[in-house]
Structure formats: C-alpha cells, structure tokens
A protein has these predicted regions:
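Conserved beta/loop motifs at nucleotide-recognition and modification sites
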Residues: 1-230
Length: 230
C-alpha cells in the first residue's frame, strides 16, 4: 500500500465537532482520497440540514459546468422553507482555475455567506489545489473549513473494521483486522466491500483467516509482496 504522510487533520476534526454538536458551519471544502469517509460526512450534513418534509426545496445543487458567481449567488439567496438552513452543493468545480474576476467574486460571496446557508464544495474526480497567496484562499480560511479526507491511521482503521463487522453480527479480533487491512489496502472505500463480502460468506459469528482467504480480493502490492517473500 502507498506510504502515508502526515495529513492535516484539523479540518476533519472541526467537521466532526460540528456534526457532533449538530451545528454545521457555513462553508466546507471536502476533498481527499478517502471517498467513503467523505460521502459519510456529506450525508451526515444533509441529514442534519435537510431533515423534514421540505428537504428537497432546501437543497440546491450546481453542476460544475453551470457554475458562475451569478449562479452561486442565486442559490445562496434562496431562503429556507420551513427549516433553519439550506444546503448548496457544488461538485468538481475548480475554484482556483476560475478567472481572476470570478475568484474575487467568489471570495466576496464566501465572506458574506448568510447564516442560513451551508455551502459545500465536493472534489471527487478532480483534486483540490488551493493557492494560499490568493484572496480566495484567505476568504475560504476565514469563512470555512477545508477538510482533507486522507487515509486513516492503522489503529483507527482496525477499530472501524471491527465496528463494521459488529454491525453485521460478526466479530473479528484486532490482529486479523490488521491482516485484512494489509491484504486489501487501507482505504475504507475498498475495505467496506470486502467486509460485507466476508461477513456474508462467514458461517460463524467469529471471522476467521479462512473466511478472509476464501473471498477477499488482495491488492496487487500484497500479491507481489507475498511472491517475493516466498
């Protein structure tokens, strides 16, 4: 598996704090390779803000190809209907590749976000590349939270793997959970499918190495490692 660098987790910790307090902020930039965790947190935001019968009316999604300062301003100006907040989502729009005039307009909009708005930029198919030298980056820093969903540390992953198996009515010990992570990689996005597959296959309540070997799909790096280590 690729080596893990020390990712900046401050944004992720702030988002978790906001979700726990049921008090979402006004601006989030969600990016990073751990898409399972990103989508989980995005869904948590939606559940908090869009719960109730008028959720559809309070959710505004802007396709990247339609994005402009004017289009964004129109969405931000939509008042919530029978709710406290609205959620505006923009996916795969490269803010920092916009023209200078547009960047300045976005910065102004970010600085003046209404209290009822939660604006979320999701980076899925394109990377997020901020430029700290720009006014736009300053506006994002002052008004919002940039959340990098990086690969999780092994200790946290082991706990998560065990929780996911328990949700399926199964149990797996810590050492075997670590072996599963080594075998299938340390991305939750990949592991969740393997966990569900193994859980469905296993006959007993306790997951065994035989269960994993029978149905898990090892990542290529692990196969090569085993061949060279043989």
């Amino acid at each position: 598996m690729p080596p893990k660098g020390k990712a900046d987790t401050a944004g992720y910790q702030q988002l978790k704090k906001d979700l726990s307090a049921q008090a979402p902020g006004k601006l989030y930039i969600l990016h990073g390779e751990e898409t399972y965790l990103r989508d989980y947190c995005l869904n948590q935001l939606k559940e908090l803000i869009l719960s109730g019968g008028m959720g559809t009316f309070n959710f505004h999604e802007i396709p990247a190809k339609e994005m402009s300062p004017r289009r964004l301003e129109e969405a931000l100006d939509c008042l919530p209907m029978m709710a406290q907040r609205t959620l505006v989502q923009v996916t795969d729009f490269d803010l920092f590749k916009a023209g200078e005039k547009d960047r300045e307009a976005y910065a102004k909009l970010f600085e003046e976000l209404p209290d009822y708005v939660c604006l979320v930029f999701v980076y899925d198919l394109i990377p997020y590349k901020g430029d700290a030298r720009t006014k736009l980056a300053g506006a994002i820093k002052r008004s919002g939270v940039v959340v990098n969903f990086a690969r999780q540390e092994t200790g946290e992953l082991v706990k998560w793997v065990r929780r996911r198996f328990r949700a399926l009515g199964k149990d797996i010990d810590g050492n075997l959970a670590s072996e599963l992570i080594f075998l299938c990689g340390d991305l939750m996005t990949n592991l969740i499918g393997e966990i569900e597959k193994i859980g469905a296959y296993a006959k007993g309540a306790q997951i065994t190495r035989a269960d994993i070997d029978a149905v898990a799909t090892p990542q290529l790096d692990t196969v090569v490692f085993r061949m060279t280590d043989a």
